[in-house]
Amino acid sequence: MSDSSRSLIPSFLYSSDHRLFQATTMSTHLKSQPLISPTNSSVSSNGTSFAIATPNEKVEMYSPAYFAACTVAGMLSCGITHTAITPLDVIKCNMQIDPLKYKNITSAFKTTIKEQGLKGFTRGWSPTLLGYSAQGAFKYGLYEYAKKYYSDIVGPEYAAKYKTLIYLAGSASAEIVADVALCPMEAVKVRVQTQPGFARGLSDGLPKIIKSEGFRGLHKGLVPLWGRQIPYTMMKFATFENTVELIYKKVMPTPKEECSKPVQLGVSFAGGYIAGIFCAIISHPADNLVSFLNNSKGATVADAVKRLGLWGMLTRGLPLRIFMIGTLTGAQWVIYDAVKVLAGLPTTGGASPATALAPSVSA
């Protein structure tokens, strides 16, 4: 690749000393050990070996392997965390849908135990796992791609000057696609969690919605979902990136590159939790709306406002959601960055001020 086809990208957008990825002669560098032997069936007929890189092998920044690693990390971070908090999600959704019956967290917990037993807290786990795994893959993978792509378009000077706009534009672009993947599973999840007897889970809930409402029934909540998730994700990524940068500049006594990996992952959790609090507040009215529309056949936005009230739309279930989303977002960034570290990549955010030479992302 010629110099003209490469672009200088401000390293604040990516949290590494780029020399870690460009140096080819390091006395401490371990030899690459492919997971798949070149003598086995992974070698194609033309002699090309398709080996998966081990953690000791170098992954070039912004290469296809880099974006693939970020996609897998995003899939794991969102799928695992959202499934783990299914019990809290059950309580939250029921409080949003039927505030007269589920008046607060305590009464919602007691009512669920009384009517459904402990099993009631696991309702909807399978569509949650599948839906948010798909969403996480697109969200994080496309965010990293879009962040690099928009930086290439504006150039290093404007990317440095308007870095927060890069974060916002990249995260919004990624979330638009990610929600299309999430929406069908979200529709099934809400029905299963808030309508006892509707279905046992994904296997019978999905066909039931398709039979009664057609495939449109799986996507009727897409626009409200965008209304909830796009502001949420923009806040999540922009706040996280800036918070982590601030922590390394103002709080940590040593530069990021001198901090141990556990310390860096701790910073990722702190930045994620702070970002999650802001995410919960800005996206909560739309979250109430999504739950109401997915639970009520033929319901409109006006019906939701009339039933819940404007104040209820803003506050119903908010304390629980702040705790849930704060913990969730912090854990997501830890898992995401841990997977990147295992792949030999840097954690996200808080880079040193040096610039890095990196391949351009083609349109």
Curated annotation (Swiss-Prot):
Induction: By salt stress. Transport of phosphate groups from the cytosol to the mitochondrial matrix. Mediates salt stress tolerance through an ATP-dependent pathway and via modulation of the gibberellin metabolism. Plants overexpressing MPT2/PHT3;2 display increased sensitivity to salt stress. Belongs to the mitochondrial carrier (TC 2.A.29) family. This is Mitochondrial phosphate carrier protein 2, mitochondrial. The keyword Lipid biosynthesis does not apply. GO terms for molecular function: mRNA binding; phosphate transmembrane transporter activity. InterPro entries: Mitochondrial_sb/sol_carrier (IPR018108), Mt_carrier_dom_sf (IPR023395), SLC25A3/Pic2/Mir1-like (IPR044677). Residues 86-123, 186-220, 283-321 are mitochondrial matrix. The chain crosses the membrane at residues 65-85, 124-143, 165-185, 221-240, 262-282, 322-342. Residues 144-164, 241-261, 343-363 are mitochondrial intermembrane. Keywords: Membrane, Mitochondrion, Mitochondrion inner membrane, Repeat, Transit peptide, Transmembrane, Transmembrane helix, Transport. It comes from Arabidopsis thaliana (Mouse-ear cress). Solcar repeats lie at residues 65-149, 162-246, 263-342.
